[in-house]
Each structure stands twice: as C-alpha cells, then as structure tokens.
Amino acid sequence: QHAADRFGLRDAGNIYGRLTNPTEDVFEQRIAALEGGVAALAVASGAAAINYTFQALAKTGEHIVASKTIYGGTYNLLAHTLPQTSGITATFVDPDAEGSFEAAIQENTKAIFIETLGNPNSNLIDIEEVAKIAHKHNIPLVVDSTFATPYLVRPIEYGADIVVHSATKFIGGVIVDSGNFDWKASGKFPWISEPNPSYHGISFAEATAPAAFVTYIRAIILRDTGATLSPFHAFLFLQGLETLSLRVERHVSNALKIVDYLSKHPQVEAVHHPSLESEPSHYLYKKYLPNGGGSIFTFEIKGDAQTAQKFIDNLAIFSLLANVADVKSLVIHPATTTHSQCTEEELLDQGIKPNTIRLSIG
C-alpha cells in the first residue's frame, strides 16, 4: 500500500531516481526557500527547465508572449523548435514599448516570459507591471532569473508565478513554483486543474496544491522524458549555495569597477549595465536591485565585428567561453556565438550589434 500511495501521488517521497532522490530534494527545498516559492524541481540543465516550463503551460496550437531581449537559445526554442515540434508559437515584444505585452496577448496565450536581467545586455523589465498584465488575463508570468539570482532580486515578491534558473551559472537548472497562481480559477490549464487520465483522474490543482505546477512537470513531463539532475550534481549545487551571497556580492563589486573603466575609455562607444544612469532601465535598477545590477553586461567597442573579435583574441586574463557567472572572468562575441541562430535583423532588434562584446566578471 505504501508503494501504491507513492506512485499514486497520495504520499510524497522518493520513488525512482528519474523523478527525485534525497540529495535533489534538499537542493530543491533550499532553492524554493531562497526564491520564496513553495516547491522547486531540479532538472539536468537550464534548457530543460525552460523547455519543461513551456511544455507544461502550452499545448499544440497555443501561444506564449516573450520579451525579445532574452538568451539566444531560448529565443530559438520559442521561435523555431517549439513551433516545429510541439505546435506552440510565440510573439516577441519590445519590453520598453508601453503596452507591448498586453497588445500581444491572444485568446490562446498561456504565459508571459521575461528575464530579470536580459541576455546579453542586462536590460531590466518592470516585473511587477508585467505580472499585473499576466494576471489580468489569467495567465502566469514566467521569469528566468539566472543573471540575478535570489541574492539580487526575488521575482515572486513582485508577482512572478514561476522562476527558472539555468545550470552551470550561479545556481543550477531549476524551476521554482510560487504557489500563488490559481490554476483552477484560470480555466486555461485543464491538464493541471481537471482530472488527468495519466494518473487515474486526479486533479493536480486539488491533490498537490499549492505545488501543482512543479508536481505536474515531475509526475508527467520529467517522468516521460527524463532530463534528470544527477544526485552528485545536486550535491555540488548545494555546496555552491553555501557561498552564493558572498560570491555574487564580490562579482557585482568587481563588475562595477570594469563598468566604470570602460565607460570612460575612448575606444568604447557604449556600455550597457543597469547601474549606469544612461541606461533606459536605470529607474528599475533602483526599484529591484538594491544589492547591485549583476556582473554580466555588454559594451560596444569602436569598430566592427572584426575589431571586437581581435579585441577578444588579445585578452590575457579573460577566458573565451559561452558560459557566465564563473569565478573567472569570461568574454564572448554574442552575434557569432550565443545568439548566432538569430538573423542580422533579429540581432539588431535585440540590441546586439556586430561590435557588441559580452563580459562576465569573475
């Protein structure tokens, strides 16, 4: 009976390594606590976390509204992969244009997606205002907070319903459920709110509230597709969490010194970091980021793409890597790497120029 109750979701606990294990469980509890959520789900990568979130919220023929200033891999997932494999479409909007998010919402829209600090320019979006728009239309706000971490901002406090972090960065591949979204009242997510045939007719919204969202992903999507985080990597992430605040504090402090230096350099056209008063989103920096604006930002060197690449090739301390948030400082040319799937027009539309260089300060 004990085993039957576990498999029937009537009793919470470990069943099988693909779904959870004790080490992952501790990691998930700590992440949920850091973000102020009710539960979390750790998976094998940030890409899996994003993909699982979208697949849990939208089905074939449905739609997602997203900021256009996001990581190139997520942009490609929404623009090409999900339409081709799942029939889920997306509309990308200018987050700085007034009314853009609400204007893009359709009858079949199932979520709004933003990043706390956009990749690669670290632009800010008014989380609180976008959350109000999402809830007005009975859909959740999903926030990728990889660049910020809960040390800098906790999106759930400003109305976000689901928070995602990417693996290999400050924290790890994880989905956090705020527990605040009313899946039953929305009426837009019957696979969560109504009897689910995959579990003999239980309603996740009733049987597993307030953690219905991550329980649905764990019990259905993770169970059937298996992008599982290993216990060893969960252990490593737990070690990292012990020093998260200290590390991010030092990252931010070092980044501000580089931002100040580049802002005054004659060979630099522009620097994009939310702490700068010249940035359009600086007023949001004051509202959301009292502990600093992160350590990942871009600048535009005077010249063209070849100038940028020559500059990168001649750096002695920085490592040329697509990752961010490492203890060592990293550099990349976004237009030809992290956002290389985008067309030239899409790159410019996202604020990425041929001479844009992204830095991640260690």
Where are these regions (language model features)?
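Conserved N-terminal alpha-helix of the aminotransferase class I/II PLP-enzyme fold
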Residues: 1-51, 73-82
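Short amphipathic alpha-helical segments
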Residues: 12, 38, 233, 237, ...
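Structural motif
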Residues: 35, 86, 266, 315-316
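Conserved PLP-enzyme active-site core in the AAT-like
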Residues: 40-265
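Conserved C-terminal alpha-helix-loop-beta "cap" of PLP-dependent enzymes
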Residues: 248, 267-357, 361
